Amino acid sequence: GQQIDQGAGVETDLPRDYLEFAALEFALNRDMPVLGICRGMQLLNVSFGGSLIQDIPGHIAGEDGSSQVHFTYVSPGSKLAAVLGGGAIYRVNSRHHQGLKDPQRATSLLASAYMPEDGIVEALESPAHSWVIAVQCHPERAKEVPTNFQNLFKGLIDWASRFKQ
């Protein structure tokens, strides 16, 4: 598979890649709930056979650690829209230099959000799994995203509490 870069100027960490691909495969094979964030969304896409755009200018964090911001369109009817309370245009943070557009998307994954200005996919989900959602933004940086993005963590906890091996 393709290597997942950790950021501009950061060396690829193959042991980390192998560990994360193995952990994701373990979870997917058991239909465990998965929430991918940033690199996690990229990892999900590559693990399903997709690829990445290796360098996307204008999406990485500033030198002072601040996030870039942009609008993302969440598709109505998607799992992500259900978690967020509806499809809409949301203002989110951006801290990544890799990503994907529809041509790089794994065909078995659905793009459930994208950036209208440049077509960068901002969220993926797997229709073959109960709860596999991945977002390019960082919802853990709560002050930089709408409050309903915290529902991603609530949804993960809810699905994890129902998970039976």
Predicted regions located by residue number:
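Hydrophobic/aromatic beta-strand patches that form the interior of the parallel beta-sheet core
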Residues: 35, 112, 133-135
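Catalytic nucleophile loop
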Residues: 41
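Flexible gly/pro-rich beta->alpha loop and the following alpha-helix that scaffold active-site loops
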Residues: 1-35, 48-49, 53, 154-157, ...
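Pocket-forming structural segment of enzyme catalytic cores
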Residues: 48-122
